[in-house]
Regions:
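N-terminal helix-turn-helix
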Residues: 1-53, 214-218
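Conserved segment of winged-helix/HTH DNA-binding domains
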Residues: 44-72, 101
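Extended hydrophobic
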Residues: 141-215
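Amphipathic alpha-helical regulatory segments at dimerization interfaces
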Residues: 9, 20, 61-72, 158, ...
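Signal-transducing coiled-coil/dimerization helices and immediately adjacent hinge/linker segments
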Residues: 225-228
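Short amphipathic alpha-helical signal-transduction/dimerization elements
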Residues: 121, 125, 210-217, 221
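Short hydrophobic alpha-helical segments used for membrane anchoring or interfacial signaling
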Residues: 79-84, 93
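Short, solvent-exposed recognition segments
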Residues: 99-167
């Protein structure tokens, strides 16, 4: 995001935003993006967020489960949470095999376009869903919101997401919710790629993913780790 865009969204002058960015960059919280004209958050800033005790507890508990999942499936996996109108990846485990596709920690994507976004949305209360829709309407066109809602209906029937990636050919997004009592607090996702020869079929990978997500969910619901 460029300085002028940030200034416009925050209702501040370019000079004010420039000074803020200068300080944040000097302290290592943001850096210039290599892919777009603007800035992105660094691991240091993300670390501050994940050091919040409940999140830290969940990630520490989830890490060995995610490692086991990656070893069994030979696929990378990641955990994502809601961040305003976006999802953000807060933890990732790579497969021990030589070939993999993974999503970096700190990766952000609009909820309306993300696999994790659909899973998070369908597993919320009616009140929370309404709040999320109102937020999405501020950032997306009416057609984009309608498409998101249509996609969510399909996901709600399945209870999980299995869909071709909207961003990378040959990748199938597999995602299950991490549930706290009756709503999703995060998602556990595998970007599935078919290898030659096939190590584990997609349906078997889904079963392993479901088991891992349920194990983490039980820890949150039953207080084994502190709640978000």
């Amino acid at each position: 995001m460029s300085t002028s865009t940030i200034a416009e969204k925050l209702g501040r002058s370019n000079a004010e935003i420039y000074r803020m960015i200068l300080v944040l960059e000097q302290r290592g919280y943001i850096e210039k993006s290599e892919d777009i004209d603007g800035y992105q958050v660094t691991r240091r800033l993300l670390q501050l967020g994940t050091e919040h005790e409940p999140i830290k507890d969940i990630l520490e508990y989830a890490q060995p489960i995610m490692r086991s999942l990656a070893e069994k499936t030979s696929m990378s996996c990641h955990i994502a949470v809601e961040s305003q109108e976006q999802i953000v990846v807060i933890s990732r485990v790579e497969t021990p095999s030589n070939l993999s596709y993974s999503v970096r920690v700190g990766y952000r994507r609009p909820i309306a376009f993300a696999a994790s976004g659909r899973i998070l949305f369908v597993n919320q209360s009616a009140e929370k869903k309404e709040s999320m829709i109102n937020l999405l309407k501020k950032h997306h066109s009416e057609e984009e919101v309608k498409q998101f809602m249509a996609d969510c209906k399909k996901v709600a029937k399945q209870g999980y997401l299995k869909a071709p990636s909207a961003f990378v050919h040959g990748v199938t997004d597999l995602s299950y919710p991490i549930i706290d009592s009756d709503h999703a607090v995060a998602t556990l996702t595998i970007p599935y790629i078919m290898r030659i020869p096939e190590i584990m079929g997609i349906d078997d990978v889904l079963k392993e993913l479901k088991g891992a997500a349920e194990e983490i969910s039980k820890a949150v619901t039953y207080g084994i780790v502190r709640k978000l």
